[in-house]
Amino acid sequence: MTPLETKRPLQLNDQGQLQHFLSLDGLRRELLTEILDTADSFLEVGARAVKKVPLLRGKTVCNVFFENSTRTRTTFELAAQRLSADVITLNVSTSSASKGETLLDTLRNLEAMAADMFVVRHGDSGAAHFIAEHVCPQVAIINGGDGRHAHPTQGMLDMLTIRRHKGSFENLSVAIVGDILHSRVARSNMLALKTLGCPDIRVIAPKTLLPIGVEQYGVKVYTDMTEGLKDVDVVIMLRLQRERMTGGLLPSEGEFYRLFGLTTARLAGAKPDAIVMHPGPINRGVEIESAVADGPHSVILNQVTYGIAIRMAVLSMAMSGQTAQRQFDQENAQ
């Protein structure tokens, strides 16, 4: 598995500001920290009686989801609305795409309607990069998840969750458990943790669900839950992505749970104050026990709350960077 290389100008404008948010690969620690700090400031907005700020007033954000995701779509909608943007959500299953219109056609038609930003979720790895580079370079593109490649806002909301509960990344042990092979969340989390200075990143999975070359992300690989969870501070569970699996990668879900399910007994091997995370949707009794998902170590619902703040931060920063780049281009064209 090789992380997709991201050219600096594609995600960042000439001033080094975010103008698209496609992947965490290649982004500096300072920029990730700025996103986290900005999201922290937006958490206060969610606690107000009137949950709005005027940063994107007059702007139009289009959510274009070619894959279903209630949680991600809803939090992007809320984030844009809290920034005072006009929001359009395209239900692809009932749109022209179901009648044969391509991704390219759909986005160019939306661009012609003067949209300022697209949040795109697509089943093909690299779709967001393609759109930003070749289809709509003058529109801010946010990757809402593309194939197995990346889910950068999920990665950042997970980092915000960890930072708010643990303070910093400097002395942490973090275990990512489950279907690493098919998980764009795992890839984004590994990149973010490494960039933010986490010294002990572990992946725990059966060999059939580990990508070739995963060690290049700076992780330690475990195929035994008891060994992998020993004294960790954070446990990030992943669901089995049956829809992306081909062939007999697993004997059964029951066998997976027996060997890799997070139970109360297994969690006892982690640190006493360990937190348990999950990007959702949760498959209870497959990757996690209900007593753990609903227990005192779980911060799963906090992740949803923090997700709105992270997406507010990314939307506002990318829109600002895209606007600054347009002004820069206009000034230099004169």
Swiss-Prot record:
This is Aspartate carbamoyltransferase catalytic subunit. One of its GO terms (molecular function) is aspartate carbamoyltransferase activity. The gene is pyrB. Pathway: Pyrimidine metabolism; UMP biosynthesis via de novo pathway; (S)-dihydroorotate from bicarbonate: step 2/3. SUPFAM superfamilies: Aspartate/ornithine carbamoyltransferase. Heterododecamer (2C3:3R2) of six catalytic PyrB chains organized as two trimers (C3), and six regulatory PyrI chains organized as three dimers (R2). InterPro entries: Asp/Orn_carbamoyltranf_P-bd, Asp/Orn_carbamoylTrfase, Asp/Orn_carbamoylTrfase_sf, Asp_carbamoyltransf, Asp_carbamoyltransf_Asp/Orn-bd. Keywords: Pyrimidine biosynthesis, Transferase. Catalyzes the condensation of carbamoyl phosphate and aspartate to form carbamoyl aspartate and inorganic phosphate, the committed step in the de novo pyrimidine nucleotide biosynthesis pathway.
